[in-house]
Amino acid sequence: MNAADESLGNVLLVGLGAVAIQVALDLRRHGAGRLGALNHPGRRSQRIAEALARGACLQLEGQGQHRWLSGNAALDVFHQDPAELRDDWQTLVLCVPADSYLDVVRGLPWERLGGVRTLLLVSAFIGANLLVRSALPAGCQATVLSLSSYYAATKVIDETQPLRALTKAVKRRVYLGSSRPDCPARETWRRVLAGSGVEVVPLATPEAAEGRNVTTYVHSPFFLGEFALARILSEQGPPGFMYKLYPEGPITPGAIGAMRRLWCELSELLRRMGAEPLNLLRFLNDDNYPVHETMLPRAAIDGFAEAGAERQEYLLFVRYAALLVDPFSPADEQGRHFDFSAVPFRRVSRDEDGLWRLPRVPLEDYRKLALIVALAAHFDLAMPQARSLLASYENAVSRFIDCQGASQCHPSLYPIDSRPAADAIYRQWCSTC
């Protein structure tokens, strides 16, 4: 472990799931001061506390070519109650679902967190930085940083062992925006993530970074549609696969068309907020999963934004067809490559109280898109494609609630009113213009 980085100081991880375990390992490798975690009280937190009391530490296993990421990290302190926090922390890292940022920030005892200099949002959506800043108390001078998305694919291996996680993939590149463009924390986090082989590209504004959250462009058209929801909300039949072509998965010409139209709507929102939109195909290929140039020539990728709608949809369809298998995996004896797209949908399940709950995909995607649509209304944008996807989700979930009975469903299944949060984002944006 390196010497402590004074620009980080003591770091508190807010939320202690798979993401936090990866971040903790990166911080320990880089060199932070004290490392603590806060997790909301509940059965899972109790299991964490019991494991820590037995002397357990955070354990990360890297899979395949990422095996070198494996390691352990000890926590100096673990809290289940925000009231227990003291003014010991200089950096807060929000490792919670993005749709809970506002509630989490409002629930922190800021009167005892006067030393906080930096807040990092690990997977921010458009407007998240402004939303968090709107919730900070008057006089708080903390810099808020937005990562475009979480930089790895990490999951807890076994819920009975909540301190063990597996990282099976790492992004090549993520983007970082700051509420203070000249803050040294941007360079600090660039070095932290470089330890896992991730390039961090600083952008001029938080919104520019947030506009490069890949799930906003991909999850919404694929997983808020009829095919995906029918599988997610059903206990019977095959689960379906998230990234396969119909009839095995949700990818159809219609879903690709929805992706292109949503990209156009999000691009206009970014422009009105003063951020540069992205070339969607270049972003998907260069920053996420590339395909062979035989399938997508470089000129087609670079010229995507200037192409006509029909050509754009054709190129996007070709990309997803090319990723049905991992195009860079070695072929087996039969000449077959790794079945890259065979990621089954997670389905609704009952929680420990016996209530039906949705998995994070599509619940978080719905909530994120609903907030973006409410924000867009302040900029006189109708976003018909986004609204159509929201309606698809709401109708499917409403039918599920009617079938199962309201008393059997967790409140999180019901639609939320995103307007108050959108109002707060817009007011904060206006105050910074």
UniProtKB/Swiss-Prot annotation:
Homodimer. Interacts with CntL. GO terms for molecular function: oxidoreductase activity. It catalyses: pseudopaline + NAD(+) + H2O = (2S)-2-amino-4-{[(1S)-1-carboxy-2-(1H-imidazol-4-yl)ethyl]amino}butanoate + 2-oxoglutarate + NADH + H(+). The chain crosses the membrane at residues 7-27. The keyword Transmembrane applies. Keywords: Cell membrane, Membrane, NAD, Oxidoreductase, Transmembrane, Transmembrane helix. NAD(+) binds at L16, G17, A18, V19, N39, H40, T154, E364. Belongs to the staphylopine dehydrogenase family. This is Pseudopaline synthase. It is an enzyme of class 1 (oxidoreductase). SUPFAM superfamilies: NAD(P)-binding Rossmann-fold domains. Induction: Is part of the operon cntOLMI that is negatively regulated by zinc level through the Zur repressor, which leads to transcriptional activation of this operon under zinc depletion.
